[in-house]
UniProtKB/Swiss-Prot annotation:
Zinc listed as a keyword: no
Source species: Gracilaria tenuistipitata var. liui (Red alga)
PANTHER family reported for this sequence: ATP SYNTHASE SUBUNIT ALPHA, MITOCHONDRIAL
Reactions the enzyme catalyzes: ATP + H2O + 4 H(+)(in) = ADP + phosphate + 5 H(+)(out)
Family note: Belongs to the ATPase alpha/beta chains family.
NCBIfam families: atpA (TIGR00962), PRK13343.1 (NF009884)
Record localization: Plastid, Chloroplast thylakoid membrane
Name of the gene: atpA
Record-level GO cellular component terms: chloroplast thylakoid membrane; proton-transporting ATP synthase complex
TM ranges: none
Record-given protein name: ATP synthase subunit alpha, chloroplastic
């Protein structure tokens, strides 16, 4: 029999006591009272935060939106079909956040940044809160750099700058998405990260957008965030904030970013649905009282940062769909008041063959010529005035039978100016060629060209400048001005093309 010494036993017991650690896990757990329509009412979550993520027994995640005295209103981020009344709910202690990183470029993700393009998980370099504070006044600088859209009508008369928020508004099927996609395609080689957020759209429409971006080699610098029409309202509601969070990751690294929200009308409708189901008091058009804050806190995140914060920028292009051209409805007026200008697309112009169907009279950019290069300022100043006078004269000429020569000339010039602003989809024009086109129009070089040949003439002029006089484009790209030498080259090119046309 072994000799067991009492002091050894006491040592072993003492060691075991020293090693013993009591782990207490405190969890905030509640009980489901009611579930249905993407909403759950939960009892017992006393210490839950507003916007906190909650986990149900079937691993469905929800967001605590309504904190009431006796229960919590939770919106579900999934189907939630296996959630039963009486089942438990656990508070996670986290606010909604997403992974971010350079590996997300070229990918299609859902509003929780999970890939939906069957290419595997991207490597994330960190996480960002979906809802984060907008930069303060001191952290910003005024918009001073242009963000070229490649659309002549916009870059000349409604210029967009880096860090600006420009609303694209119009009825359905007037080319709103086309304007946004052209802008993304035009950023090729400009070192701009683009994010396209599709909210409540058909999966086929999103697939078409992705296919277009791929064909134009624009997907390499673009992230697509898609929440389809059959996704829960919660995902449609958070999709724009996810897009903004992904853009902020690049913005705070000093990069220029462009975010397209297509469209915020559907986000407002999803938020209205959630609010009504949570029994929040309805206001105008049954939207909740904080629907203005829904959009303002999103669009205020767009900014041009000062040099101390890296000088990055986030440009926002929110899209709003109107009903029968009514821009005085609740959501359109809200977003118009938040943004720095709007591009109004008209159904009548679209149907009469003027595409992009931009109504120059109602459209405006509140940043103005600060977002233009000097060459464009030199030629575009007269364009808006000439078009406005032409629109007035055209309306008047429908009643008058005999017009004097000066009026006829002005009408003829206006028709040609309108013609040069027409542009095919997915074919953005570089700024130096836009300058040449507008110069040709406002200085009367097209007055003796047949109206049906104007587009052909413009194409020939662009080709001549590219092939025979490349120094013209080089001069504008480097100096940003239309110098006397460049103007001489342009006049020479116009004469050469005119001779070819008159033969």
């Amino acid at each position: 029999m072994l000799n067991i010494r009492p002091d050894e036993i006491s040592n072993v017991i003492r060691q075991q006591i020293d090693k013993y650690e009591q782990e207490i896990q405190v969890a905030n757990i509640g009980t489901v009272l009611q579930v249905g329509d993407g909403i759950a009412r939960v009892y017992g979550l006393d210490e839950v935060m507003a916007g906190e993520l909650l986990e149900f027994e079937d691993q469905t995640i929800g967001i605590a939106l309504n904190l009431e005295s006796d229960n919590v209103g939770v919106v579900l981020m999934g189907e939630g079909r296996n959630i039963l009344e009486g089942s438990s709910v656990k508070a996670t202690g986290k606010i909604a956040q997403i992974p971010v990183g350079d590996a997300f470029l070229g990918r299609v993700v859902d509003p929780l940044a999970r890939p939906i393009d069957a290419k595997g998980l991207p490597n994330s370099s960190g996480t960002r809160l979906i809802e984060s504070y907008a930069p303060g006044i001191i952290g910003r600088q005024s918009v001073c750099e242009p963000l070229q859209t490649g659309i002549t009508a916009i870059d000349s008369m409604i210029p967009i700058g880096r860090g600006q928020r420009e609303l694209i508004i119009g009825d359905r099927q007037t080319g709103k998405t086309a304007v946004a996609l052209d802008t993304i395609i035009n950023q090729k080689g400009q070192d701009v990260v683009c994010i396209y957020v599709a909210i409540g759209q058909k999966a086929s429409s999103v697939a078409q957008v992705v296919s277009t971006l791929q064909d134009e080699s624009a997907l390499d610098y673009t992230i697509v965030v898609a929440s389809n029409a059959d996704d829960p309202a919660t995902l449609q509601y958070i999709a724009p904030y996810t897009g903004a969070a992904l853009a902020e990751y690049f913005m705070y690294k000093g990069k220029a970013t462009l975010v397209v929200y297509d469209d915020l009308t559907k986000q407002a409708q999803a938020y209205r649905q959630m609010s009504l189901l949570l029994r929040r008091p309805p206001g105008r058009e049954a939207y909740p009282g904080d629907v203005f804050y829904l959009h303002s806190r999103l669009l205020e995140r767009a900014a041009k940062l000062n040099s101390e914060l890296g000088g990055g920028s986030m440009t926002a292009l929110p899209i709003i769909e109107t009903q029968a051209g009514d821009v005085s409805a609740y959501i359109p007026t809200n977003v118009i008041s938040i943004t720095d200008g709007q591009i109004f697309l008209s159904g009548d112009l679209f149907n009469s063959g003027i595409r992009p169907a931009i109504n120059v009279g109602i459209s405006v950019s509140r940043v103005g010529s600060a977002a233009q290069i000097k060459a464009m300022k030199q030629v575009a100043g007269k364009l808006k005035l000439e078009l406005a006078q032409f629109a007035e004269l055209e309306a008047f000429s429908q009643f008058a039978s005999d017009l004097d020569k000066a009026t006829q000339n002005q009408l003829s010039r206006g028709q040609r100016l309108r013609e040069i602003l027409k542009q095919a989809q997915n074919s953005p024009i570089p700024v130096e060629e836009q300058t040449a086109i507008i110069y040709t129009g406002i200085n009367g070089y097209l007055d003796d060209i047949n109206l049906s040949q104007v587009q052909e003439f413009i194409e020939a002029l662009r080709e001549d400048l590219r092939n025979s006089k490349p120094e013209f484009g080089e001069s504008i790209r480097t100096t940003k001005k239309l110098s006397a030498e460049a103007e001489e080259l342009l006049k020479q090119s116009i004469e050469d093309v005119k001779q070819a046309f008159s033969v």
